[in-house]
Amino acid sequence: MNEAVKTLDGWFCLHDFRSIDWAAWRELNPGNQELMLNELSHFLSDMEITKNIGEGEHTIYSILGQKADLVFFTLRDSLEALNEVENRFNKLAIADYLLPTYSYISVVELSNYLASHMAGGDDPYQNKGVRARLYPALPPKKHICFYPMSKKRDGADNWYMLPMEERQQLIRDHGLIGRSYAGKVQQIIGGSIGFDDYEWGVTLFSDDALEFKRIVTEMRFDEASARYAEFGSFFIGNLLLSEQLSKLFTI
């Protein structure tokens, strides 16, 4: 049997995509709308406290197209904590007007090979650079791109039948492309084998949305992607600050 890849795991992630029920929202009087938005604001203030004490992260983006209107991206140190946030959000009055359209569960991961290389032989979990990758601060970039992906298991193009050394070399070459976009695109890789329908959830952040097109296009021509990758739906959106929510929901 081929050797399975070993990973270091950090925060658990929930991408929660919602569509606004504008027809139902319009039926509410402005007073009720304001009460719901205030309740949402208090919820987000509590989320900010958790972020400030280093026990999690979150961000909100407005999604383009008809797949969703919003994505709430939340990171926590356990599935229980993540589920608690999800349940509390669903109990908000405004949640009745935010219809679920898609979700994705994963855990921020780093390959043991890369983590050991970064740590130089020391305990990777005590290395500042490794910890920054496993427990990332979400950048306030203008745009987000999220997509799930898996590795193929199709005849000769079966990623999991390749020897470990060949997989490592392919990933190393693939990673060089990503590193060439340092400063332009920040990525968070969430492992989701056994958690969701695909094997990874990829989240990209950038101030220039065209960088998403450039990096994904370039990676498509790399062998690790061209031969062995399968992709789900892509979601792209714009940063939505908490103070901008009232404007979004104003009819």
From Swiss-Prot:
Keywords: Heme, Heme biosynthesis, Iron, Metal-binding, Oxidoreductase. It catalyses: Fe-coproporphyrin III + 2 H2O2 + 2 H(+) = heme b + 2 CO2 + 4 H2O; Fe-coproporphyrin III + H2O2 + H(+) = harderoheme III + CO2 + 2 H2O; harderoheme III + H2O2 + H(+) = heme b + CO2 + 2 H2O. Its EC number is 1.3.98.5. InterPro entries: CHDC, ChdC/CLD, Dimeric_a/b-barrel. GO terms for biological process: heme B biosynthetic process. Fe-coproporphyrin III binds at residues 133, 147-151, 174, 187, 225. The keyword Oxidoreductase applies. Pathway: Porphyrin-containing compound metabolism; protoheme biosynthesis. The keyword Cell membrane does not apply. GO terms for molecular function: heme binding; metal ion binding; oxidoreductase activity, acting on the CH-CH group of donors, oxygen as acceptor; peroxidase activity. NCBIfam families: PRK12276.1. PANTHER family: COPROHEME DECARBOXYLASE (PTHR36843:SF1), HEME-DEPENDENT PEROXIDASE YWFI-RELATED (PTHR36843). Homopentamer. Homohexamer in solution. Involved in coproporphyrin-dependent heme b biosynthesis. Catalyzes the decarboxylation of Fe-coproporphyrin III (coproheme) to heme b (protoheme IX), the last step of the pathway. The reaction occurs in a stepwise manner with a three-propionate intermediate. This is Coproheme decarboxylase. The gene is chdC.
